[in-house]
Each structure stands twice: as C-alpha cells, then as structure tokens.
Amino acid sequence: DLLLAGCTDELDAKNETYKVFECAGAVETVVFANRIIETKQYDCVVVIGAIIKGDTDHYEYVCQYVTNGISTLSATHSLPIIFGILTTQNEELAYERAAIDRMNKGKEFAETALFMINAFNKL
C-alpha cells in the first residue's frame, strides 16, 4: 500500500505516534472514521485509500458519499480529518500519485495532518 507507506514513512521520520486501522472499503471509511473520532483518543484522522472509476455510475456515488461524509464529520466534530482518498479515472493515475519515487500523496497527507494538529494546538 504505497499511500500508507508514504504517510507512515513521513510520520516515522518526524518521530510521531500513530495507529493504523484497516477498513473494508471506501464507503465504510465514513462510519469507521466517526467511530475513531468518538474514542476521543486521536488529534487527527487520516483517511487513506483509492476510488478508481469503473464502467458504471457507482464511482460517482461512492466519491460523492465519501467526500460529503468525511467533510461533514470533520465539521461536526471539529477535528482535522485528512481526505487521503485518491479518486482517479484509472489505476495508472492512482499509481502515479502513490509511487514512492514520485509525488507520493501519502507523504503529503502526513504533512497536512501534522500541520493541522499543530494549528489546532495553537488555538
């Protein structure tokens, strides 16, 4: 999982503490993130994954549901939730955004999480 590796490598490089959970699929990330937030144990949640377009309209519905769900959770709980779900037209585009030797978005998700935690701590 290249996105996860990019994210955890960056957090490890900064000596940050984190916990990794796995979820069944993109749609389930919304309720899973909500449950993580409800534990009140974490300063931030980074949701990582990929939704790749297929031949049906399902892609559009999943993208919309997950995007709306995650943004609603973040606003409702006043907790940073980093939207680390790639939404691409094909696997090649997803790989380009996840490859460690290129612009690994996982690293960017970790950087954003650390920035937001720091910003919230200043409030």
PLM features: residue spans?
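Short, acidic/small-residue loops that bind anionic groups at enzyme active sites
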Residues: 60-87
